[in-house]
């Protein structure tokens, strides 16, 4: 076996891609900071039970496991940073009011999420803790869309759903609640025959409502139809009102409502939003409310947030990150060294061509040169 081969769905990040990823990372973190989000850096490795407090069986399957040589306990390589941030909010910061946190870091998956997906993502995201109102969801949705626009993306489609609709239907019917996981699978997969089979012996109102969910999709006007076809429960009315406000705020993007798009239902407790880009089959960003996420750490606070993969964002973003630079000669000259240092202090990229390599500059566009004129070093266009 060749020593340079990497595992399947694992790849090096080469300079041009790394530069673009770093450009986008800086743009997004700067935007998060402008909203008041504080950055945290959780560890890549934790005890397994700390990493698997939420997310269900899917997160467990996606998490790499290994034995700690110091304690003998099982460790996990994180597959999602969100539970770690919840731990920080609940256990370390322990604040009483609203807390805004953001992060950017690597996550590892045992299996790729798609045919060509990487198993090593660079996850970046933002979370609000401590506010149960829709205002926090509106802010997170706006921040997610801002992030995508900063990456130069257009023709964004925002898909909205709400975990509260199915939760309300199951809460009123114990027989349906006992089949909750199977119903979730049928609804998420739009498997109408299976859904019909699972609901055949349920009460008429519950059966009609569950069978209506796969057909309640479209633009924001579908919410009016949902109010007609779903039971007049306060929880459902509140969920539909939340979706209406989220749809109304999403200016300049296409909005789609899909009340059966319940991916992540076991994780979420309220509104869920997913962003898609034309020509890209998989979601580029996901977010939503997950109020129970800190419960395992002894402090369940209201929480909402979003995340995306920077590597995938860099792949589809039109942002140009090829740096310009100043080409300088190599010489044992104090004045030259001082000129180069001054330019670098001013934020310029200065590349000194080593002897014999004056024209080998693969990654940077050297559009200027540092040349000596009348005893002084000056920058001139190339």
UniProtKB/Swiss-Prot annotation:
Gene3D superfamilies: Bira Bifunctional Protein, Domain 2
Annotated metabolic or biological route of this protein: Amino-acid biosynthesis; L-histidine biosynthesis; L-histidine from 5-phospho-alpha-D-ribose 1-diphosphate: step 1/9
Keywords per UniProt: Amino-acid biosynthesis, Cytoplasm, Histidine biosynthesis
Subcellular location, record wording: Cytoplasm
Pfam families (alphabetical): tRNA-synt_His
Major localization class: cytoplasm
GO cellular component terms attached to this protein's record: cytoplasm
GO biological process, one term: histidyl-tRNA aminoacylation
Domain of life (superkingdom): Bacteria
One of the record's GO molecular function terms: histidine-tRNA ligase activity
UniProt family annotation: Belongs to the class-II aminoacyl-tRNA synthetase family. HisZ subfamily.
Known partners and oligomeric status: Heteromultimer composed of HisG and HisZ subunits.
Described purpose of this protein according to its UniProt entry: Required for the first step of histidine biosynthesis. May allow the feedback regulation of ATP phosphoribosyltransferase activity by histidine.
NCBIfam families assigned: hisZ_biosyn_reg, PRK12292.1-1, PRK12421.1
Other comment: This function is generally fulfilled by the C-terminal part of HisG, which is missing in some bacteria such as this one.
Name the UniProt record assigns to this protein: ATP phosphoribosyltransferase regulatory subunit
Protein source organism: Burkholderia multivorans (strain ATCC 17616 / 249)
Gene: hisZ
């Amino acid at each position: 076996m060749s020593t340079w081969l990497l595992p399947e769905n694992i790849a090096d990040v080469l300079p041009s891609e790394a530069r673009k990823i770093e450009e986008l990372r800086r743009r997004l973190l700067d935007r998060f900071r402008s909203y008041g989000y504080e950055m945290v850096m959780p560890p890549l490795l934790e005890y397994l039970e700390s990493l698997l407090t939420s997310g269900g069986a899917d997160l467990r399957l996606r998490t790499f496991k290994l034995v700690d040589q110091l304690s003998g306990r099982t460790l996990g390589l994180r597959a999602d940073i969100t539970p770690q941030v919840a731990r920080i909010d609940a256990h370390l910061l322990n604040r009483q009011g609203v807390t805004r946190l953001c992060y950017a870091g690597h996550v590892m998956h045992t299996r790729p999420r798609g045919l060509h997906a990487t198993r090593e993502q660079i996850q970046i995201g933002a979370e609000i803790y401590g506010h149960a109102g829709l205002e926090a969801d509106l802010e997170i949705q706006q921040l997610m869309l801002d992030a995508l626009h900063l990456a130069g993306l257009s023709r964004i489609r925002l898909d909205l759903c709400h975990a509260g609709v199915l939760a309300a239907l199951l809460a009123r019917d114990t027989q349906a609640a006992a089949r909750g996981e199977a119903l979730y699978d049928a609804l998420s997969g739009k498997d109408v025959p299976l859904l019909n089979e699972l609901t055949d012996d349920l009460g008429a109102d519950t059966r009609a409502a569950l069978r209506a969910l796969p057909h309640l999709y479209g633009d924001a006007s579908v919410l009016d139809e949902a109010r007609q076809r779903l039971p007049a429960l306060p929880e459902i009315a509140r969920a539909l009102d939340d979706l209406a406000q989220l749809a109304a705020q999403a200016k300049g993007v296409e909005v789609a409502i899909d009340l059966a798009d319940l991916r992540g239902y076991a994780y979420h407790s309220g509104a869920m939003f997913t962003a898609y880009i034309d020509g890209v089959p998989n979601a580029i960003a996901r977010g939503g409310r997950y109020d129970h996420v800190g419960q395992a750490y002894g402090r369940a606070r209201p929480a909402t947030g979003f995340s995306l993969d920077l590597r995938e964002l860099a792949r589809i973003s039109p942002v140009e990150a090829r740096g310009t630079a100043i080409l300088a000669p190599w010489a044992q000259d104090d004045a030259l060294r001082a000129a180069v240092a001054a330019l670098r202090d001013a934020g310029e990229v200065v590349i000194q061509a080593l002897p014999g390599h004056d024209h080998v500059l693969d990654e940077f566009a050297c559009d200027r040169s540092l040349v000596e004129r009348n005893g002084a070093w000056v920058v001139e266009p190339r």
